[in-house]
């Protein structure tokens, strides 16, 4: 959402003006107007951005900017900063590589830093999710890495004796399955949000798994889902653990599923992902299709 003199400079007139927020302009209209303005200016220049992670994952974006002078500076900065913020939340990463405009790189570095106006994103996306603060670097186009996003095969396994669970804000759902047939299912009420002791969560998760295991001759694999950002079965942040200190999350709860796998479940396959991914998986299995949004 964009307002003030930047809208006036772009001369955008939405078809519908919100009564309670007459200055509101949908970002898509602003972006379209900016891109048309840049395309019409022969002095426009290209900027290339790569958003990367420590594991080598890389997402690329390219676009044209207006000559970086006068009133165009505010327009260019608004356009790129909004694009970068969207990419951080859509794709995810902690290193921003900028080629083609050093002034834009400097602007991003001054905003995505401690004390900058995007300090929250700098800390949350960078430190909490990807392990280190967001960093902005100036590079040449030749130095930008190629786009790379490793794919991961998720689930669709029904054979054998398996446990599935979901951690919610009001209850823990757990089921035992034998060759695709549910032999046990239970929802156990719990209150995780403001519990300060990590052991409360650990004991609750293990309790649900043991209840399900009691209905199986053996346990071949465990799969689970939870609210929050979960990468490689490790919790980076989750509303379920909001009462637990960041120190305890990093020390204990972040790797709770790996710890349970090793200490309680003999290192059998034990995978946990975000609950939206499991919803997408269920939809994909039901429709016998791929690329389903959960």
Task: Report residues per predicted region.
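Long, contiguous juxta-domain segments that are non-catalytic but functionally important
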Residues: 145-163
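Short glycine-rich, Thr/Ser-proximal phosphate-binding strand/loop in the N-terminal lobe
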Residues: 37-39, 46-72, 167-207, 236-243
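Short, well-ordered amphipathic alpha-helical segments that serve as non-catalytic structural scaffolds
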Residues: 82-83, 199-215
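N-terminal accessory interaction module
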Residues: 13-148
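Short, Lys/Arg-enriched N-terminal segments with co-localized hydrophobic residues
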Residues: 1-9
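Flexible, charged surface loops at secondary-structure boundaries
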Residues: 40-43, 86-93, 156-158, 214-217, ...
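Glycine-rich phosphate-binding loop and adjoining helix at the ATP-binding site
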Residues: 69-79, 87-91, 102-139, 188-203, ...
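Short glycine-aspartate micro-motif
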Residues: 95-97, 160-166, 219-223, 271, ...
């Amino acid at each position: 959402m964009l307002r003030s003199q930047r809208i006036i400079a772009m001369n955008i007139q939405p078809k519908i003006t919100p009564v309670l927020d007459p200055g509101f302009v949908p970002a898509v209209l602003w972006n379209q107007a900016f891109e048309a303005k840049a395309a019409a200016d022969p002095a426009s220049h290209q900027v290339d951005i790569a958003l990367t992670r420590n594991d080598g994952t890389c997402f690329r974006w390219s676009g044209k900017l207006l000559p970086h002078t006068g009133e165009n500076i505010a327009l260019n900065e608004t356009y790129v900063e909004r694009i970068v913020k969207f990419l951080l939340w859509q794709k995810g990463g902690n290193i921003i590589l900028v080629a083609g405009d050093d002034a834009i790189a400097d602007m991003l570095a001054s905003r995505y830093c401690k004390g900058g106006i995007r300090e929250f994103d700098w800390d949350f996306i960078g430190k909490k999710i990807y392990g280190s603060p967001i960093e902005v670097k100036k590079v040449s186009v030749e130095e930008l890495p190629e786009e790379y996003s490793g794919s991961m095969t998720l689930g669709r396994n029904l054979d054998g004796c398996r446990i599935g669970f979901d951690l919610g804000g009001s209850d823990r759902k757990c089921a035992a399955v034998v060759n695709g047939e549910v032999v046990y299912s239970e929802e156990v009420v719990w209150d995780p949000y403001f519990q300060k002791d990590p052991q409360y969560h650990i004991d609750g998760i293990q309790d649900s798994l043991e209840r399900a295991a009691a209905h199986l001759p053996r346990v071949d694999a465990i799969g689970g889902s939870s609210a929050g950002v979960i990468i490689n079965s490790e919790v980076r942040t989750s509303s379920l653990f909001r009462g637990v200190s960041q120190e305890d999350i990093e020390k204990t709860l972040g790797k709770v599923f790996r710890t349970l796998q090793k200490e309680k479940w003999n290192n059998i396959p034990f995978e946990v992902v975000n609950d939206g991914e499991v919803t997408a998986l269920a939809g994909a299995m039901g429709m016998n299709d791929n690329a389903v949004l959960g």
